[in-house]
């Protein structure tokens, strides 16, 4: 009887462990596919609206990003890549936090995934210079950037991301200039 109780206990413990592990794996897979672990995403907020939201005590973490545009060129035909500015919280919530180096701080610094670097044929080494053409809703820019941060990236994501500095974003992002 004692053996039967032990075996039944082991069986139920194993079943619950497997079920919880499966649920966790499914949640992680969904987050990776959508590109974020955030519970909500709100687009096209003004800065005043963002500040109002961020002061809400019911919100645990809040980050923001500004979409700049898309990387263009043959290197990006099979690896769609968008360029944006994102604060540290945004980078963490979207799995874009560098594990080598740091987020962009200086005007022409850039951070990206090893997937993008492979597509461009560049080494995953901080300090690497890269020329990049960016298309926004209103213009096209070609600039040289210095790689300051690198993360693994995720092949299941619907697009890859390159993060640019706030000062560069303020110079080129159409939304900041009231053009979109």
Please provide the spans of the model-predicted regions.
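Short, strongly hydrophobic transmembrane alpha-helices
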Residues: 1-21, 37
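Basic-flanked hydrophobic alpha-helices used for secretion and membrane insertion
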Residues: 20-180
């Amino acid at each position: 009887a004692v053996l039967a109780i032990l075996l039944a206990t082991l069986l139920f413990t194993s079943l619950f462990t497997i079920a919880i592990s499966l649920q966790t794996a499914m949640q992680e897979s969904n987050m990776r596919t959508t590109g974020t672990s955030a519970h909500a995403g709100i687009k096209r907020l003004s800065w005043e609206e963002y500040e109002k939201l961020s002061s809400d005590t019911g919100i645990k973490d809040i980050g923001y990003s500004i979409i700049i545009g898309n990387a263009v060129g043959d290197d990006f035909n099979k690896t769609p890549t968008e360029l944006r500015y994102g604060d540290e919280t945004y980078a963490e919530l979207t799995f874009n936090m560098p594990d080598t180096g740091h987020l962009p701080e200086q005007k022409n610094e850039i951070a990206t995934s090893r997937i993008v670097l492979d597509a461009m044929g560049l080494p995953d080494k901080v300090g690497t210079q890269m020329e990049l053409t960016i298309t926004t809703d209103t213009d096209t820019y070609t600039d040289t950037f210095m790689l300051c941060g690198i993360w693994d990236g995720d092949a299941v994501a619907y697009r890859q991301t390159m993060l640019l500095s706030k000062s560069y974003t303020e110079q080129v992002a159409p939304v900041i200039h009231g053009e979109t």
